[in-house]
């Protein structure tokens, strides 16, 4: 099973990625992890990546595609793989296709923006312990205070509404064309399949939808 997983920040993609990788016995591949591993391994491609990163440049799509081809040739990808965070753009999707990397399924975890803002902007954290609360879904016993220590809770920068909305706008501007690309591909060639899974509900309900989509 070769899967591309799409979903906005806060859509619950990480939870479903874990389910998919465990269910199908496939690795989760992210470009960030792949770049770091290549640099650490010191392969010819890794040295090229290191040179680009050390000079403050952006690693080109060509290099990333080469890394992907190298990565998916490894034994743990024999049964497939899950791409998380790649491709992000149409040129990357086209380069992936042109490189002969076949994909079985593109899965989008879809959640309304206002729901994501509510999920993320309502989070509060106890900095010292990492305990996480939510104003609506898991409130502390005393508003703004950690249950165990009574210390103040904070809101992380990433969880502030303005930041969340900015990240969502960026995601939509990048991903909407990608969604259209894969929907057209599915309609005209039948592969990869494209499924939009509703990401609202309990974790078990969403997981059941994902499982049904990939069946």
UniProtKB/Swiss-Prot annotation:
Span list, region NMP: 30-59
Q: Where in the cell is it found?
A: Cytoplasm
Is the Kinase keyword given for this protein?
yes
Pathway this chain belongs to? Purine metabolism; AMP biosynthesis via salvage pathway; AMP from ADP: step 1/1
The record ties this protein, via PROSITE patterns, to:
ADENYLATE_KINASE
Return the broad EC class.
transferase
Name the chemical reaction catalysed here: AMP + ATP = 2 ADP
- Give me the residues that bind ATP, please: 10-15, 123, 132-133, 201
Q: Where does AMP bind?
A: 31, 36, 57-59, 85-88, 92, 156, 167
The stretch of residues making up the signal peptide is none
For this record, the Gene Ontology CC terms, alphabetical, are: cytoplasm
Subunit annotation:
Monomer.
Q: Which NCBIfam families match?
A: adk, PRK00279.1-1, PRK00279.1-2, PRK00279.1-3, PRK14527.1
**Protein name per its UniProtKB record:** Adenylate kinase
Provide the gene name from the record: adk
């Amino acid at each position: 099973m070769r899967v591309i997983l799409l979903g906005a920040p806060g859509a619950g993609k990480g939870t479903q990625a874990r389910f998919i990788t465990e269910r199908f016995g496939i690795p989760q591949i992210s470009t960030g992890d792949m770049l770091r591993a290549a640099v650490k391994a010191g392969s010819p491609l890794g040295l090229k990546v290191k040179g680009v990163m050390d000079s403050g440049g952006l690693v080109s799509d060509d290099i990333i595609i080469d890394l992907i081809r190298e990565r998916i040739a490894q034994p743990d990808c024999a049964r497939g793989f899950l791409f998380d965070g790649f491709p992000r753009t149409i040129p990357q999707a086209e380069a992936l296709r042109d490189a002969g990397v076949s994909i079985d399924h593109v899965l989008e975890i879809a959640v309304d923006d206002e729901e994501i803002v509510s999920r993320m902007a309502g989070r509060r954290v106890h900095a010292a312990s990492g305990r996480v609360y939510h104003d609506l879904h898991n409130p502390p016993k005393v508003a703004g205070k950690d249950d165990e220590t009574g210390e103040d809770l904070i809101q992380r920068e990433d969880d502030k509404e303005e930041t969340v909305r900015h990240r969502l706008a960026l995601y939509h501007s990048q991903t909407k064309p990608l969604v259209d690309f894969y929907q057209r591909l599915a309609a005209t060639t039948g592969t990869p399949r494209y499924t939009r899974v509703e990401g609202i509900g309990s974790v078990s309900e969403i997981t059941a939808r994902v499982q049904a989509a990939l069946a």
